[in-house]
């Protein structure tokens, strides 16, 4: 194992280009940027935790949700892809029983005493709660872990809908899994991370984000048994036909402060399920739901009913998207993407926040996408939890420059990313 200074020198000399190319592609400009990024992270680790320490470097990807918007937490299907935007973590094991994490862009150094397992007052919604919760998740499955020091640098924008939280969680879990040889599978690590986000961080998320970051590629997941989801991995290079590009636009509206809005979607769906004596909509017969519509409107209210309709339709649509990918029928897939986007407006109602109708960045981005892509073979939809954050668009090459320019004229330079998908999940790179 090399020291941080030794690794920095090796990276800048190109000794680790093959490992970097496996994650980010072999484009020389991309490799040059990643060399500089990794070298800077190693330098920052030394600044905060001292020189001469033997370190390892980890990467955990963000994800683009391809289908299954707000279906995973109801025992439904999910479809997502890992992307090359990722979190990089430089880590060294320690022996004092503390975890110390410094993240680029945040002033605070997280210091977690592993002897204190319970959620701490005032810690929820902060990264320290995720670290503490992940540690407890390892212990809950009988794994012995200890402390480490880490510096992280993330290209997954916070609150952007690319799941920066899952990338951070999987980065932390990967460090423990490697440094302490716990031997857990990617799916098991994802479950621990979801537990931390639900129980310690206080966000009632599903499991799709963590699974995608853990496994990589394109994954189709069946959450009928959320404890043991059934996972199919599709090769990422099978998504886009020649000349088609996946763009994600950051509308510069973070949903990091919208936990209550996300929670309401899950709560309302489960309120409808409870009328049938079930905890999740995935356990409710769809025909019975439609037969009970008059009673459900009275008991649960119309928004809850509409969100339940969204669940049933989006779930069927996600299965159809998977089948279209297997059959390499991109036009069918694209049509389903547009249907999903329409459902977010009409049924799930998570494109904008009703408490702040003045700000509707997602709506503007979707309207602009429709104006440019309507009539083409492209498609567009909101992605992620909603209310703010990002949209995605499948853009034909002949329209890419026009689309990119128009989007950035509205949302600013650097707001539109042309994403590359990634086969690898969270991994030790060096």
Feature map (PLM): residue ranges:
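Glycine- and acidic-rich phosphate- and metal-coordinating loops
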Residues: 135-157
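Structural signature of FAD isoalloxazine-binding scaffolds in flavoprotein oxidoreductases
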Residues: 76-96, 215
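Glycine/serine-rich anion-binding loops at beta->alpha junctions
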Residues: 59-64, 68-75, 155-172, 376-394
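Beta-strand segments within the central parallel beta-sheet cores of soluble alpha/beta enzyme folds
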Residues: 100-102, 147-154, 183-195, 334-339, ...
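Phosphate-handling active-site elements
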Residues: 140-148, 175-192, 397-410
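C-terminal nucleotide
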Residues: 1-63, 67, 88, 92-124, ...
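Fold-level recognition of mixed alpha/beta catalytic cores in primary-metabolism enzymes, strongest
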Residues: 160-248, 430
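A short glycine/serine-rich beta->alpha loop
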Residues: 53-54, 70-77, 116-124, 154-162, ...
